[in-house]
Amino acid sequence: MSVLDAAEIMDLIPNRYPILFMDKVDELNPGESIVCTKNVTINEEFFQGHFPGNPVMPGVLIIESLAQAASILILKTEKYQGKTAYLGAIDSAKFRKVVRPGDVLKLHVTMEKQRDNMGKVKCEAKVEDKVACSAELTFIVPDPKKKI
């Protein structure tokens, strides 16, 4: 059973197909941690060119998946509700395992620091409990009345 389904996810973040990279939220502790699921299918548009005959999910899209999970965690925190979270920086990104069609990508995000309109999260994307990607992401949640 999911905590948030696809429709509820789309109520929180602005991403839509083909750039929405999560199917459901499995666990959510606002302000602390989140676990989400992305079912990776052969129907993903990026597999047409990455790579024909050897489909592999691009690492940058795994990072984007983690950033979307982080956005949900951030935006479910009371002070950020109704706003948009933006990716500000990627640190210590490591790719350890390829992600292929048929894999279930589990996105684990933990809040590390938070202050004013920014913060840092620690992330891991796992397939069958093996780390495919890890990174630290910095986020910014600007005042919606100000242009960034």
UniProtKB/Swiss-Prot annotation:
GO terms for biological process: fatty acid biosynthetic process; lipid A biosynthetic process. The active site is at residue 50. Its EC number is 4.2.1.59. It is found in: Cytoplasm. It catalyses: a (3R)-hydroxyacyl-[ACP] = a (2E)-enoyl-[ACP] + H2O. The keyword Lyase applies. Keywords: Cytoplasm, Lipid A biosynthesis, Lipid biosynthesis, Lipid metabolism, Lyase. Its main location: cytoplasm. Pfam families: FabA. It comes from the Bacteria. CDD domains: FabZ (cd01288). InterPro entries: FabA_FabZ, FabZ, HotDog_dom_sf. NCBIfam families: fabZ, PRK00006.1. Belongs to the thioester dehydratase family. FabZ subfamily. Involved in unsaturated fatty acids biosynthesis. Catalyzes the dehydration of short chain beta-hydroxyacyl-ACPs and long chain saturated and unsaturated beta-hydroxyacyl-ACPs. PANTHER family: 3-HYDROXYACYL-[ACYL-CARRIER-PROTEIN] DEHYDRATASE. This is 3-hydroxyacyl-[acyl-carrier-protein] dehydratase FabZ.
